[in-house]
Amino acid sequence: MGAFDYISSFCSYTYANAKTKRKPLQTVDIKVKMDCDGCERRVRNVVRRMKGVKSVEVNRKQSRITVNGHVDPNKVLKRVKSTGKKAEFWPYIPQHMVYYPFAPGMYDKRAPAGHIRNPTQSFPTANAPEENYVSLFSDDNVHAACSIM
């Protein structure tokens, strides 16, 4: 039977080939303003009924929902917004995760304790005026200083 099974594996259509790929297991954090138990229950039930959701944690004190499962973050956000609540992705990260947390614009009065705003890495544009002044007197370009004099 071993040879017959080996040959039939090439000819048959197996379930493994038809199996669809699932999204990877991920955690989605969403900030939602919830005032009462009814709001919390409504948001929890809407998210819990989504396909692929493993667990839902609601923290009303922080106005935060944490969803674990095989889900698309944008679909979770859209589903939470369908309840009529204003929702956005969680904009805060723990303070110890940032290399330099003392940069301006990082602290927010509404952020929970030990969290700061998620920093955005902004680099200066190539033709910024400060860039031109800094490179004017650099040691790499010796002839630039002579052109001014």
Swiss-Prot record:
Residues 25-88 form the HMA domain. Disruption phenotype: Hipp20, hipp21 and hipp22 triple mutants are cadmium sensitive. A lipid is attached at residue 146 (S-farnesyl cysteine). It is found in: Membrane. One of its GO terms (molecular function) is metal ion binding. Residues 147-149 form a propeptide. It comes from the Eukaryota. Its main location: membrane. The modification Cysteine methyl ester is found at residue 146. Expressed at low levels in leaves and sepals. InterPro entries: HMA_dom (IPR006121), HMA_dom_sf (IPR036163). PROSITE patterns: HMA_2. GO terms for cellular component: membrane. Keywords: Cadmium, Lipoprotein, Membrane, Metal-binding, Methylation, Prenylation. A metal cation binds at residues 36, 39. One of its GO terms (biological process) is detoxification of cadmium ion. Heavy-metal-binding protein. Binds cadmium. May be involved in cadmium transport and play a role in cadmium detoxification. Belongs to the HIPP family. Interacts with ZHD11/HB29. This is Heavy metal-associated isoprenylated plant protein 21. The gene is HIPP21.
